[in-house]
């Protein structure tokens, strides 16, 4: 969105993406799911569209925005191919299958307006005194302004910034697991019967405050979805939940988080 807005205002942004274009990335992800062969720079976390492309496409936010930016995001997604129902649904959802098309369409618009996107390119250093960034350890690019949209799991980039003396602070986090159960079980509890007809796959959100002050709650519930391997490092495991637009999978899943 940053690149898109800059291009809309007449700038020619250069977007540096460590991963692959979304179509190539889709093939890398599918190969990983089938064979276990991981590309550390093109996977569920890294590549065009970021981690969100393969993370269900839910568009929920608890941030109140009087300036209308949340609405702008939804309208922009529709402009580039997302279903119009995200404009009025209480819990708008695009789905990974449609997000791939939306991401590609946004990229094409950015380049049409004069922007550039360099794939398989990673910022490996910043040199503030020279107003430069270093790409892939060798190419130096001068710029008066750089936006670091680090995203999810780029701990090597965070380490580089720390080594460069960038101020940063720790952030609290929650720990949990992802659970999976038949979608028919959730439908039966929500609708009173397993056959839901034309009703959508049912969802849920649960929370509990314990006597010891700890909390437990469900998060990122995926009706009719899938639990997927979301690893981005060799010999490391990360799991995530996702669903396609139709939410037609046999199972539902959700993260269960403790604080």
Please name every model-derived segment.
Residues 1-259:
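Residues forming the flavin
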